[in-house]
Amino acid sequence: MFVKDGCSECSTRVKALQAQKQPFDVYMVGSQNDDERIRNWAITSGIDPANVRTRQITLNHDGGRWLGLSLGGDLPAVVREVNGQWLRQ
C-alpha cells in the first residue's frame, strides 16, 4: 500500500486493511528517508505496533517505487502483483 503524510483517506484505508488481519507493506511516498516521520504517521493512523514487530505490517520508505510503477492516480493506493504485473486494487 502506498500512502503519504497528511492523507486522512490513507489512514482510513490502513485501518480497514489492518482489520482484515492480512499482512501488508506500507510505502510512504515523500518520506525523505525519515524513519521518525513514518513512525509518527503509523501511530496517528492507528497501526498496532505489535503488527509491525511481528512484520505482519512493514513500514517502508517509497524510494521512488510509486513513480516506477507508473500506475498514476491519487493515494492511497493498494497494489498487488498479478502474473508479474502490478495492478491497483
Regions found by a protein language model. Give the residues of each.
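Extracytoplasmic/secreted cell-surface and envelope-processing proteins
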Residues: C10, E36-R37, Q89
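Short, surface-exposed basic-aromatic patches at helix termini and helix-loop junctions that form
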Residues: A16-Q22, A42-I47
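Thiol-based oxidoreductase modules, predominantly thioredoxin-like and allied folds used
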Residues: F24-R39, N51-D62
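Conserved redox-active cysteine motifs that mediate thiol-disulfide chemistry
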Residues: M1-K15
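Solvent-exposed coil/turn segments that connect beta secondary-structure elements
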Residues: K4-G6, S31-Q32, N83
